[in-house]
Amino acid sequence: MAFSPTGELWEVEHGPRGGDELNLIEKGKNYGWPLVSFGNNYNGVPIPKPDMRPDLAAPVIYWVPVIAPGNLMFYTGNKTFPQWNGNGFISGMGTTSLNRFIFDGHGGAKAAERWNVGKRIRDVEEGPDGSLWMLEDANPGALIHVTPK
């Protein structure tokens, strides 16, 4: 979970087999798990799709196949990568990628870029200087420092 620069609370959900989600969290809403999902149970049994339950909140974005998200963070730097100020980043373990998203401040989001890192990325954080730090999910793992070229 992470708060956007505009104060919205967002969360990423590592779903079942398929159906990872990005949700805008709002008071009183039910986001469906385990009642609905865009994925299936690991044993192959289907889970009802969200459109079958209009009383439950649908995700803003969902992934099939999965990205296996590790975490979500919002970039607030204005020196190292000023063009990303206010953007969200989601680490991808299943896609071995770093994923950038643009949030509109009104409950909407869209995918902007996906960079294949070739490693399962568990976590991404902004450093004090505005660079990015990624944590590889491996044994042994590694810290990957992202700076401009």
Q: Positions of the model-derived regions?
A:
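Beta-propeller domain segments
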Residues: 1-110, 141-142, 146-149
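Conserved blade-ending motifs and adjacent loop-strand segments that build the rim/top face
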Residues: 107-128
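Blade-level signature of beta-propeller repeat domains, shared across WD40, Kelch, NHL, RCC1
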Residues: 123-149
